[in-house]
Amino acid sequence: MKALPIIALFSLILSDTQAQPNSTNHQGKYHKNLTYKGHITGDEITYTLYLPPEHTKTKAPYPLIVFLHGAGGGNSSSQVLMSYEAARKSGKIGDFVFVFPEKYGGTVWRDGAKGKRPETNILKELLPNLEKEYAVTDNRNQRTIMGFSMGAAGSIYWGAKYLSLFSTTVSLDAGGGTSFTDPKARNYVPEYGTKTKTIQKSLNIRLVQGALNTRNFQQSLGMLKIDYEYEQLPREISNYTTGSSCLSRKDPTKKFLHNPACMTEGSWGERTWSFIEKNTKRVK
């Protein structure tokens, strides 16, 4: 057998390592810190990818959930997926591919903020590649945009702006900076005013609040007669059991609701996954 040159051998080993799941804590295939070079921008796009158990291109196409992180940029994919897999095991939701874009802290998921281009990177560069390489659907009726905190604001924004790409948006503890009338708002979403009728008919919205609030945005949705599902996490600490992610690690006698693990655990987490499944039009 011919010996491979050292560089070629190293490349082969590296490629194989990158293609393999890097966690045994999940039922599906969990690939963290993958990179893809954008064909439009040339940017290196970092992301975490989750493929459901027994994923294969012959079962294509797979519904998709894009999960946007908060302002700090922390990767909460493992905790979110543990909640999803528990719901999947109990039959509340079916198979989904997940993508967790990384390293967009402070951008509110807008091109140009902090010198980043998350809209172009994810929607125009990464998603087409995932469709090709991992049999991800291009059908908007099988796509959900979901996020936590700043990512929740991003999901509200992307859901309305990119109606051709997503049919469901899930916002987990967004703050109060969302407005469809104020261009100076941190999360300015004029599409809710300019595309009202289309949004009324074709966008499924779920808002889940923990420590923060979206009262003004909820009032706007009501004024515009845009339907949405709303859930507030329990306010009494007695509703959270020992070991809950909704309790402070430093002082378990205090609540800590503003974190993705808390926002996706418990009965409210199950209702979120059920909401996504209910609004995903699967091909039979």
What are these regions (language model features)?
Residues 3-13:
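Sec-dependent N-terminal signal peptides
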Residues 15-19:
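Sec/Tat signal peptide C-region and signal peptidase I cleavage site
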Residues 20-284:
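Non-catalytic cap/lid and distal C-terminal segments of serine-dependent acyl enzymes
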